[in-house]
């Protein structure tokens, strides 16, 4: 090897160090955000010394941080020693930008970063790490996420920022105009619901979330005196009576929960969903086989550290939806980080009498999580039987991304699953 040329060993070592130092890169970004450096630079070219004087900080530390930001492409250095924001920072890191991601990044810098410091413990235990990260034992992960009003607002603002970038895309992946009543389940600040109301003015839209979240949304996220474009309804979607709707939106909800809780929730939604209705699921879907993409794998680890669930493959979401009575699922990638899945309502899961015959099929009984006993699980399950479900590939963007479970043929048996035993007769029009 010629002197000065990088060999394979050197390249591998450079890659290794890049991976090992990744946390330092994140902390440079997080510290600059926390100190407000990008907001200061948004006012015009600014010298590191002036920034240090404004904040009362170490001149040397400020200079080092701003130089690191420059090398990372977050700031631009001028020949006179001043700094300005890069285009990326002006778009995503300045407080007043319509596309700012500042609050989401600050949430990652705090609660999320703290949980990731205990990744090895999370892998050993297979559970969230709030007790180590923030000193709260969290059987219900949202009691830790919403552990104080400032934390609740930071999390809600972070999600609002996410939907400012991605909301329109996932809401137009399918034409939702035929759904007259739309409910955004776990809709937080109402950002996604308000975008739905704007895109589909003929529909009535509501947000359903926990009482403290709804109170915060009304206080901090609605313009004073303005008539809101959506309704806000308070409740617990595992315990409370759910509003009736033609379409339920679950945006980044199912990945919070294990399979039993997902089927429990989806079963409750089946009973609240009107005939001909559907679910719109928004998730970072894993590729077939679950080996990627990397972002979804990292998010799945994050769900282990911060919640009870994980990211899933499209077939996993199809199976969960089918068990709860939403047997036809379409998947689309509208651009951006998330997939959109439309799962259409079928007959109620449980005992179904075949049309034109006296044959019956027995559905399964899945209770999921007992909410009255923290941390308790129920393994009770009945039996499932029946035939007649067929699969056909859905061609999207040139490849088969998922299969669609079609309606059973007349006279066939269908096994379903819900969070309690149900029975009914399969009638014409149930399969929409």
UniProtKB/Swiss-Prot annotation:
The active site is at 255 (proton donor/acceptor). It comes from the Eukaryota. Induction: Exhibits very slight night/day variation, if any. The keyword Cytoplasm does not apply. Substrate binds at residues 256, 302, 306. S-adenosyl-L-methionine binds at residues 146, 163, 209, 235-237, 252. GO terms for molecular function: acetylserotonin O-methyltransferase activity; identical protein binding; protein homodimerization activity; S-adenosylmethionine-dependent methyltransferase activity. Disulfide bonds: none annotated. It catalyses: N-acetylserotonin + S-adenosyl-L-methionine = melatonin + S-adenosyl-L-homocysteine + H(+). InterPro entries: COMT-like, O_MeTrfase_dom, Plant_O-MeTrfase_dimerisation, SAM-dependent_MTases_sf, WH-like_DNA-bd_sf, WH_DNA-bd_sf. GO terms for biological process: lipid metabolic process; male gonad development; melatonin biosynthetic process; methylation; negative regulation of male gonad development. It holds the Pfam family Dimerisation. Expressed predominantly in the pineal gland (at protein level). Very low expression, if any, in the retina. Pathway: Aromatic compound metabolism; melatonin biosynthesis; melatonin from serotonin: step 1/2. Keywords: Lipid metabolism, Melatonin biosynthesis, Methyltransferase, S-adenosyl-L-methionine, Transferase. Its EC number is 2.1.1.4. Residues 373-432 are annotated as: Disordered. The keyword Nucleus does not apply. Catalyzes the transfer of a methyl group onto N-acetylserotonin, producing melatonin (N-acetyl-5-methoxytryptamine). Belongs to the class I-like SAM-binding methyltransferase superfamily. Cation-independent O-methyltransferase family. Pineal melatonin synthesis is severely compromised in most inbred strains. In many inbred strains, genetic defects in ASMT have been identified. Melatonin production may have an impact on gonadal development, testis development being significantly promoted in melatonin-deficient C57BL/6J x Mus musculus molossinus animals. Homodimer. This is Acetylserotonin O-methyltransferase. It comes from Rattus norvegicus.
């Amino acid at each position: 090897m010629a002197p000065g040329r990088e060999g394979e060993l050197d390249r591998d070592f450079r890659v290794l160090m890049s991976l090992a130092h990744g946390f330092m890169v994140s902390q440079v970004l997080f510290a600059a955000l926390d100190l407000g450096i990008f907001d200061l630079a948004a006012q015009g070219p600014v010298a590191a010394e002036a920034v240090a004087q404004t904040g009362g900080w170490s001149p040397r530390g400020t200079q080092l941080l701003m130089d690191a930001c420059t090398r990372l492409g977050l700031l631009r250095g001028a020949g006179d020693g001043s700094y300005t924001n890069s285009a990326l920072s002006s778009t995503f890191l300045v407080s007043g930008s319509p596309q700012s991601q500042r609050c989401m990044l600050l949430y990652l810098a705090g609660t999320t970063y703290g949980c990731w410091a205990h990744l090895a413990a999370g892998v050993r235990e297979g559970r969230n790490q709030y007790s180590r990260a923030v000193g709260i034992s969290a059987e219900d992960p949202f009691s830790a996420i919403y552990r104080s009003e400032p934390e609740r607002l930071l999390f809600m603002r972070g999600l609002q920022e996410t939907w400012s970038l991605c909301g329109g895309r996932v809401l137009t992946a399918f034409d939702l105009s035929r759904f007259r009543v739309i409910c955004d389940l776990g809709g937080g600040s109402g950002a996604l619901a308000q975008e739905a109301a704007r895109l589909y003015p003929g529909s009535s839209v509501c947000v359903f979330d926990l009482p403290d979240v709804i109170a915060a949304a009304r206080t901090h996220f609605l313009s004073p005196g303005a008539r809101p474009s959506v309704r806000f309804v308070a409740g617990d979607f595992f315990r409370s009576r759910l509003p009736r709707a033609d379409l339920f939106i679950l945006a980044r909800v199912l990945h919070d929960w294990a399979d039993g809780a997902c089927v429990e929730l989806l079963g409750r939604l089946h009973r609240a969903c009107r005939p001909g209705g559907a679910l719109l699921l928004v998730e970072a879907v894993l590729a077939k086989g679950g080996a990627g993409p990397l972002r979804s794998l990292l998010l799945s680890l994050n769900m282990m550290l911060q919640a009870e669930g994980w990211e899933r493959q499209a077939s996993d979401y199809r199976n969960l939806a089918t068990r709860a009575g939403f047997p036809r699922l379409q998947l689309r990638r509208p651009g951006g980080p998330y997939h959109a899945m439309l799962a259409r309502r079928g007959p109620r899961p449980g005992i179904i009498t075949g049309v034109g015959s006296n044959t019956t099929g027995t559905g399964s009984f899945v209770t999921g999580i007992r909410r009255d006993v923290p941390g308790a699980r129920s393994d009770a399950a009945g039996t499932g039987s029946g035939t007649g479900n067929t699969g056909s590939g859905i061609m999207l963007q040139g490849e088969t991304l998922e299969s669609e479970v079609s309606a059973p043929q007349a006279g066939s048996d269908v096994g379903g699953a819900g969070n309690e035993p149900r029975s009914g007769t399969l009638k014409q029009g149930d399969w929409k």
